Structures are given as C-alpha cells and as structure tokens.
Amino acid sequence: MFDFKVLSRSTNTAGRVGRLSTPHGILSTPQFMPVGTLGTVKGITATQLKDTNAQMILANTFHLHLQPGEAIIKESGGLHSFMSWDQPILTDSGGYQVFSLGKLNKIDDFGVSFKSPRDGSHIELTPEKAIQIQMDLGADVVMAFDQCPPYPASKVEVEEACKRTHLWLERCVATHSKEDQALFGIVQGGCFLDLREESARRVASFHLPGIAIGGVSVGEPSDQIHKIVRHVAPLLPNEVPRYLMGIGTIREMAVAVANGVDFFDCVLPTRLGRHGTALVRDERWNLRNACFRNDYQPLDTTCVCETCTNYNRAYLHHLIRNDELLGLTLLSLHNLSHLIRFSRAMAVAIEDDCFSEDFAPWQKSSIAHYTW
C-alpha cells in the first residue's frame, strides 16, 4: 500500500526524483506541501488547490483535536471525506504547537499537559494519544510525537529533548496499528551536529517508512538550517522518503533537494498571500504599493496559475488595498503555484541531470534572474 521508489538521481548532487505511493494517490518528489492547519488551506477550495498541482497537504493534529475533535471527523468518514480532499494527507503530531505554548505547558517523560488556548481546559497529550488521534483522523502519513526544542537552547536542553523524542518514538511505534497509514519518525538535535547524528541513527533504527528532519525553521538563521540539512540528510536511509519540516522558501528548498530531501511544507506562501504579498521570481512584492496602481501586466509573466492567467497587477492592487477576500485568495493561489512549480522545475533538472548547473545559484545566494 505504501511504496517509495527513487526514479532519477543527480550526478553531482544528492538530488533525486521519487514516487511515494499512498492509499489516496501518488506524491511525486521533490514536492512542496501546502499547509491546511484546520483541514483547510486558508481561503482556498479543494478544487482550486488541485489546480495549483498540489499533490499532498498537511493538517494539524493539535488544532483538529481542539476543534472540531477527532470523533466528529472520524464519524464523517475521516479527514479526506471531511474536507473533500481525495489526495494524500499528512498530519503532524501536534508536538511543535504544544511546545510553542511555552509557560502554558508542563513536559515530562509521560507526555505534555497544558491549558487549551481555546477555552482554558486541561489537556494531556501523550505519544499514545497523539497517534490515536491521528489514526482517527485517517491521514495517509502520520508523524511521531516529538519534543521540538526552541532556538536558542542549551546543549543540555536539546539533549534532553532528543532523549525524550526517542523514548516517545518507541511508544508511538508500539501504539500505531493502522496498516493504511505510514508512521514517520522525526530527527531532532537543534544546531548541535553530534546530537543530530545520534538522533538520525536512533530514528533510522526503527526502520520506519519515512523520516523527517524536525526542529528547523524555529528561529535559527538560514545558514544554520543549511548546515543541519547538509549534515543530516546524507545520514538517513536511501530507501525511504525524507521530509524537511517547516521549510518554504526557494533557497531552502534548493539546498534541501541538493542534499537528498524529498518534500517539505510551510505556511509561508499562504500567510504572505493573506498579507498582500506575492512571491515573484526570488522577490516578495507588496501589492499594496502604489507602483502597481496602473500596472496592467500579469502578476508573474512566467506563471500560468489562475491568478496570473486571468488578473493583472492593478486589479490585484485594488483588491488588496480594499481588503477584498478575493485578493488574498488569488495571491495565496499564486504563491502556492510558485513553490509547486519550483519543485517541478527541480525534478525536471534532476531528470535531465542538469540540477547542479541550473540550481547552483539558489544554493548560494538569492539571484534576480532564472530560467525555470
């Protein structure tokens, strides 16, 4: 039911093109996953999402547990039915969201207890409960419950989080029993490469169908992210997909793919869209700016998404300046299309064995002109 195959490899980098088969379809890699935290990619319908060529989306276990609750979703036929999305879904474990609550939570080896940010009620989340919730939600790929240390954190704090992550992974594996779901483990270790090495070794020892690199994009500078990815990705098994969590800029994506990462997710493209910002080439354009008031060109002349095909910059400027919901949707659609198109361009370059030449600039610094 789950199968991952590497179809092409880059000669001069670790980049690869793959195919992950799931019960709800194929994920072609490398691939960017849109984030649908509450079972929706904000402001976008499932049909519109498919038009961006999105293949798999991420939903958030923590938030869906709080509202509407996994029982409601299970009764509706599972998350695919609930949100009318018939393609692959990945659910994260909720660990990052819980730990981001800071003083609202208490952590020990048993699990995490915290006050609900919605109504103040007391909630306990353990590895067993996180997996049970995800089994009820019915996603194709589910993530182990982990402890994501903040940045910065001392080595002692990060080492403790790693040990707890590995302990919890054992309990996640023991609890997970759904054959039509793939459980992925998560490598932690902060910016300490020796801890990353040990975590990669421990997680790989469980022989899971996929492994994620977690604990990045939590406030550390981009050069630290690159160092972690370059060090950790080669340590992971070749035969399983590698998922870099929380990454959504073209530079980070290019570095990740060059080092053998297969897919990634981020809220950035839709968050920027909701704030009136478009991703165009390697730049971010604020459509509120007056320079777009009488600019009648397509948003991105190289893009064929719904937004760029049908609307000009002046109209988008008008929508954004007047806080029209359509403007936020159109920019979000374009931004998602932009990153998904970039993913596909990297795949084609790997297949043609020109990835190291075509995408080398993106791995070094931002540039203003490109050919994809």
From Swiss-Prot:
<feature type="binding site">
    <location>
        <position position="303"/>
    </location>
    <ligand>
        <name>Zn(2+)</name>
    </ligand>
</feature>
<feature type="region of interest" description="RNA binding">
    <location>
        <begin position="246"/>
        <end position="252"/>
    </location>
</feature>
<dbReference type="InterPro" id="IPR004803">
    <property type="entry name" value="TGT"/>
</dbReference>
<dbReference type="GO" id="GO:0005829">
    <property type="term" value="C:cytosol"/>
</dbReference>
<keyword id="KW-0671">Queuosine biosynthesis</keyword>
<keyword id="KW-0808">Transferase</keyword>
<dbReference type="GO" id="GO:0008479">
    <property type="term" value="F:tRNA-guanosine(34) queuine transglycosylase activity"/>
</dbReference>
<dbReference type="GO" id="GO:0101030">
    <property type="term" value="P:tRNA-guanine transglycosylation"/>
</dbReference>
<comment type="similarity">
    <text>Belongs to the queuine tRNA-ribosyltransferase family.</text>
</comment>
<feature type="region of interest" description="RNA binding; important for wobble base 34 recognition">
    <location>
        <begin position="270"/>
        <end position="274"/>
    </location>
</feature>
<dbReference type="InterPro" id="IPR050076">
    <property type="entry name" value="ArchSynthase1/Queuine_TRR"/>
</dbReference>
<feature type="binding site">
    <location>
        <position position="308"/>
    </location>
    <ligand>
        <name>Zn(2+)</name>
    </ligand>
</feature>
<keyword id="KW-0819">tRNA processing</keyword>
<feature type="active site" description="Proton acceptor">
    <location>
        <position position="92"/>
    </location>
</feature>
<comment type="pathway">
    <text>tRNA modification; tRNA-queuosine biosynthesis.</text>
</comment>
<dbReference type="InterPro" id="IPR002616">
    <property type="entry name" value="tRNA_ribo_trans-like"/>
</dbReference>
<dbReference type="GO" id="GO:0002099">
    <property type="term" value="P:tRNA wobble guanine modification"/>
</dbReference>
<feature type="binding site">
    <location>
        <begin position="92"/>
        <end position="96"/>
    </location>
    <ligand>
        <name>substrate</name>
    </ligand>
</feature>
<feature type="binding site">
    <location>
        <position position="215"/>
    </location>
    <ligand>
        <name>substrate</name>
    </ligand>
</feature>
<dbReference type="GO" id="GO:0008616">
    <property type="term" value="P:queuosine biosynthetic process"/>
</dbReference>
<feature type="active site" description="Nucleophile">
    <location>
        <position position="265"/>
    </location>
</feature>
<dbReference type="InterPro" id="IPR036511">
    <property type="entry name" value="TGT-like_sf"/>
</dbReference>
<keyword id="KW-0328">Glycosyltransferase</keyword>
<dbReference type="Pfam" id="PF01702">
    <property type="entry name" value="TGT"/>
</dbReference>
<keyword id="KW-0479">Metal-binding</keyword>
<feature type="binding site">
    <location>
        <position position="305"/>
    </location>
    <ligand>
        <name>Zn(2+)</name>
    </ligand>
</feature>
<comment type="function">
    <text>Catalyzes the base-exchange of a guanine (G) residue with the queuine precursor 7-aminomethyl-7-deazaguanine (PreQ1) at position 34 (anticodon wobble position) in tRNAs with GU(N) anticodons (tRNA-Asp, -Asn, -His and -Tyr). Catalysis occurs through a double-displacement mechanism. The nucleophile active site attacks the C1' of nucleotide 34 to detach the guanine base from the RNA, forming a covalent enzyme-RNA intermediate. The proton acceptor active site deprotonates the incoming PreQ1, allowing a nucleophilic attack on the C1' of the ribose to form the product.</text>
</comment>
<keyword id="KW-0862">Zinc</keyword>
<feature type="binding site">
    <location>
        <position position="146"/>
    </location>
    <ligand>
        <name>substrate</name>
    </ligand>
</feature>
<protein>
    <recommendedName>
        <fullName>Queuine tRNA-ribosyltransferase</fullName>
        <ecNumber>2.4.2.29</ecNumber>
    </recommendedName>
</protein>
<feature type="binding site">
    <location>
        <position position="188"/>
    </location>
    <ligand>
        <name>substrate</name>
    </ligand>
</feature>
<feature type="binding site">
    <location>
        <position position="334"/>
    </location>
    <ligand>
        <name>Zn(2+)</name>
    </ligand>
</feature>
<dbReference type="GO" id="GO:0046872">
    <property type="term" value="F:metal ion binding"/>
</dbReference>
<comment type="subunit">
    <text>Homodimer. Within each dimer, one monomer is responsible for RNA recognition and catalysis, while the other monomer binds to the replacement base PreQ1.</text>
</comment>
